């Protein structure tokens, strides 16, 4: 089985576990279908490409459409490769469901596109404090000084200034799987997830699960939810 799956963010709610309210994000994860596989002998690595969603055939590039037809699956909106778990194999056209990949108490890393906020000031983009709110000046939300004089005679790269904010790829590490509802292809993840409702997200086995703090968090999560 793959080490990840593709899903769609539905929204947020809360569930009660042992009398404690847990804020969770609801994600419709799968069902996904295998488009093709990569092997160590032929490609140099082991992976599987999963598809999610639907798309009109007329809007699909012909090379990609040929992949879907070869696997005997419907044209999909999203296609992405995931590494395979050790010693496991899948076949093109095979259905992958959320319960095949994750279980309660697992730690997952979730990648998505953050909400786009357009051109914003430094107070919103970088959390600047701004100037005093008293009267007598007009610089309440201004950026302030952006450099020196003759030396260096320019604005340093990476200087925090106003500009485009959001609409970036963001990954949140080590989120806990609170519950899985197989009959609805739904997974409940503790905390917030990047992106707007109905946006595509990618769920993967967490990279922090093998670290010391990650192992402690995983054991605590398993004891609470599993």
From Swiss-Prot:
It comes from the Bacteria. Pfam families: Ribosomal_L3. One of its GO terms (biological process) is translation. InterPro entries: Ribosomal_uL3, Ribosomal_uL3_bac/org-type, Transl_B-barrel_sf. Gene3D superfamilies: 3.30.160.810, Translation factors. GO terms for cellular component: cytosolic large ribosomal subunit. Keywords: Ribonucleoprotein, Ribosomal protein, RNA-binding, rRNA-binding. GO terms for molecular function: rRNA binding; structural constituent of ribosome. Belongs to the universal ribosomal protein uL3 family. Part of the 50S ribosomal subunit. Forms a cluster with proteins L14 and L19. One of the primary rRNA binding proteins, it binds directly near the 3'-end of the 23S rRNA, where it nucleates assembly of the 50S subunit. This is Large ribosomal subunit protein uL3.
